């Protein structure tokens, strides 16, 4: 089933302000929130749809991409409501619902159990060469991660003590509160959804039960990846809370500038100087490519700025079975630091051109004719 237009989902115009988008989303989220519609699959789908639309339209960069390209212009891994369920909701929308739903919006809830939270996603920026992007690249990266505290063995409590049942929620992790005409379930303010509290925290991890560590991960960069694309490593983000799933790691790729080529999608461009004699007489020219050397024929009388297209000498994109093209933009080079003999030869050559009339320099004749008519 095709996705609905995000503006249609929220019921706002395409030129709606950020405040209008926020108000429209809040109205829909309150109407379809699972706490108000616990047994309604339809309400759950409406809630997810509104959540996804708001996440895209409340971010200026995502909104610009969506306005230009529609659903194809936004990353399906970013903000996809189905991927995370309701996990991460508090992080993205706590400013809207913090006063109404509290932290309970941040995760799922077991029946009668403490709140379960999905771990936060992590970002890692990585630079690679154009050659690595074109051919693919396997590497290792070291990223900060969390591990169970070795002093308290993950309990968060000082050795010799243990966590105790929270007296406020009686181990449930949530408390029920009434606000206006409806009752809502809210994360326990004392234990923050864990169902327990720690009278004497571990001094090593400060009661969190986990400590920072560095983790080494294998990353496979696919051939054809482009600058700014992200690689998702599922489950390698921060760990969840109370048994919640771990977040994901997103490796963002940045391609270093290349000394020869400029990339444009799957195509490559390069500027190539050629001797003026080759431009005048024509000949075979060798040009570098990412797969080795290639050659092409320069026609007699080639002018500076002429572009030659070498089909299939570009980059094979991620979703393409055919490589792009290489565009060679030739620049006719004027010789410098001439010897006296070379100067004399060029003067003789110039004289022979003048004797032959304008047929040797049609562009110059055309230009001077235009200038002459301009002053008449």
Swiss-Prot record:
Keywords: Chaperone, Cytoplasm, DNA replication, Metal-binding, Repeat, Stress response, Zinc, Zinc-finger. Zn(2+) 1 binds at residues 149, 152, 202, 205. One of its GO terms (molecular function) is unfolded protein binding. Its cofactor is Zn(2+). It is found in: Cytoplasm. GO terms for biological process: chaperone cofactor-dependent protein refolding; DNA replication; protein refolding; response to heat. Zn(2+) 2 binds at residues 166, 169, 188, 191. A zinc finger (CR-type) spans 136-214. Homodimer. The J domain is necessary and sufficient to stimulate DnaK ATPase activity. Zinc center 1 plays an important role in the autonomous, DnaK-independent chaperone activity of DnaJ. Zinc center 2 is essential for interaction with DnaK and for DnaJ activity. This is Chaperone protein DnaJ. It comes from Burkholderia thailandensis (strain ATCC 700388 / DSM 13276 / CCUG 48851 / CIP 106301 / E264). The lineage of its organism: Bacteria, Pseudomonadati, Pseudomonadota, Betaproteobacteria, Burkholderiales. The gene is dnaJ.
